[in-house]
C-alpha cells in the first residue's frame, strides 16, 4: 500500500488508469465512472488553547472572530478555504497571519500563542483544544472516498476500501 499526493487535475486519469486505487478528497471528480461516498463529515469550529482569552467568553461574535490571528491550512500556495468562501459572502475577511500545509503542526502553535484555527470539532477534541461555535454559517467539512467503477468487484479493493472507511470513522470518534 502506498499513499501520496496527486494533483486534482490528474486524479481522473490516475483513477481510470489504475495508477491510483482511491482518492480521499473534499472535491472528488464528478464523472459517472467515478464512484464516491462520504467517509467523514464534521462541523467547523474555532479552536484555541484552553487558557486563551476566548475560553472565558460565552459566545464568539463575528467581529471577535475577524479580529483574531488565524492559522490557515492549505496544500495550495494561494486561495481560501470553505470558511473563507463563507466569509466572502458576508463581504468580510479573517486575518490570516500564518499559512501552513498541514494541520499536524497547529496544536503546538496554538498551545503557545493566541492564534486560532478554524478546524473540525473532531480535530479540536482530539488535540484537547478549547473551541467555540463559528458565528456564521459554513458548510461542514466533508471528505469523500473516490474510486474507479472498474474496481467495484475486486476483493482487495473492497477490503482496502473498508479499512479506509473504518479508519476515518475511528478518527472522528477519538
Task: Annotate each PLM feature.
Residues 31-70, 154-158:
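Flexible hinge/capping segments at coil-to-helix
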